[in-house]
Regions:
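Exposed alpha-helical structural elements
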Residues: 18-21, 43, 110, 114
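Active-site-adjacent core segments of small-molecule enzymes
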Residues: 24-27, 45, 122-127, 132-133, ...
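Phosphate-interacting basic helix/loop segments used at nucleotide- and nucleic-acid interfaces
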Residues: 35-49, 122
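An N-terminal amphipathic alpha-helical segment
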Residues: 55-97, 101
Length: 163
């Protein structure tokens, strides 16, 4: 008679993490971040208007688990202009501190941050697999942000024949 050792590891003990509490905390954090956005957006539009910028375009592209903003362009009417070297307050939450942190960011950096935030909120994982591309328009005159989002996907069609 031979003695056979088990080949499977012993089962793991039950988790001691309260996942319901983790989800509640994440939901509360997301709500706090969402509550900061209107004031950040208003400060951005005020800064763009003061600089004479009528709108900003942001193009992005990604696929294969990698994506980024390709270009951020500022416009005064139909004329491309440079962003001025000014900073505005931007309210944010960091991972390691529950308090709101006020940062001084350039207008261009605030545009970039908001674009990434809105992409994550509306189309999380946009850069994965076949990816996506598109454009934001931050319209300072209308005080609105417009997103055109193009999702790539692989499709297949089945054809059957009998001969």
């Amino acid at each position: 008679m031979t003695h056979v050792e088990p080949t499977l590891a012993a089962p793991m003990p039950p988790s001691s993490i309260d996942f319901a509490q983790v989800f509640v905390a994440q939901s509360e954090r997301s709500a706090r971040i969402d509550a900061l956005r209107p004031a950040n957006r208003d400060r951005l539009f005020d800064g763009l208007t003061a600089a004479g910028i009528t709108h900003v375009t942001v193009t992005f592209d990604g696929e294969g688990d990698s994506g980024q903003i390709e270009n951020i362009g500022a416009w005064a009417g139909d004329k491309a202009v440079d962003f001025p070297a000014v900073e505005i307050p931007y309210a944010a939450l960091t991972w390691d501190n529950p308090e709101v942190e006020m940062r001084q960011l350039s207008l261009e950096d605030v545009v970039e941050q908001l674009a990434y935030d809105f992409l994550a909120d509306t189309h999380g994982g946009w850069e994965n697999n076949n990816g996506a591309y598109g454009e934001f328009c931050f319209d300072a005159s209308a005080r609105c942000i417009h997103l055109e989002f193009n999702e790539r996907f692989t499709s297949s069609e089945l054809f059957t024949h009998e001969f």
